[in-house]
Amino acid sequence: MPTINQLVRKPRKSKVEKSKSPALNVGYNSHKKVQTNVSSPQKRGVATRVGTMTPKKPNSALRKFARVRLSNLIEVTAYIPGIGHNLQEHSVVLLRGGRVKDLPGVRYHIVRGALDTAGVNDRKQGRSKYGTKRPKA
């Protein structure tokens, strides 16, 4: 326990909260070619690479991912949720935050049903999370 005098000399420091999705907290001014300090809930980007990767132990699968260059010129890895997708190189995608626990380095999700990304076909439940329209009765 510090003495009052020690606290007067060197006060307590508050913890710095680190963002879990840092690329969404950076804007870009293309006229001045300078990064700005503007946060956004989603960001648009262009897929530069689409592929699969294997998860950490103890899981086993081929998880779909895309390497995306965002509108603020930062390049990140994003997960493609749902069964099947139509993404390829140069597809324009919308990104949201949210990591994938068993894929190291994947801190973002691609929003299904927005921009060039199609919704998941034949999905009946939880459709809003996968950009699927209501089926005709």
Swiss-Prot record:
rRNA-binding as UniProt keyword: yes
Q: Which InterPro entries match?
A: NA-bd_OB-fold, Ribosomal_uS12, Ribosomal_uS12_bac
Chain spans, region Disordered = 1-57
Q: Which residues span the membrane?
A: none
Which GO biological process annotations does it have?
Answer: translation
Please give the superkingdom of this protein's source. Bacteria
Q: Does the keyword Ribonucleoprotein apply?
A: yes
Q: Which Gene3D superfamilies match?
A: Nucleic acid-binding proteins (2.40.50.140)
Q: What does this protein do?
A: With S4 and S5 plays an important role in translational accuracy. Interacts with and stabilizes bases of the 16S rRNA that are involved in tRNA selection in the A site and with the mRNA backbone. Located at the interface of the 30S and 50S subunits, it traverses the body of the 30S subunit contacting proteins on the other side and probably holding the rRNA structure together. The combined cluster of proteins S8, S12 and S17 appears to hold together the shoulder and platform of the 30S subunit.
Q: Which family does it belong to?
A: Belongs to the universal ribosomal protein uS12 family.
**Quaternary context:** Part of the 30S ribosomal subunit. Contacts proteins S8 and S17. May interact with IF1 in the 30S initiation complex.
Protein name, per record: Small ribosomal subunit protein uS12
Q: Which organism is it from?
A: Streptococcus pneumoniae serotype 4 (strain ATCC BAA-334 / TIGR4)
Lineage of the native species? Answer: Bacteria, Bacillati, Bacillota, Bacilli, Lactobacillales
| Gene that this polypeptide is encoded by | rpsL
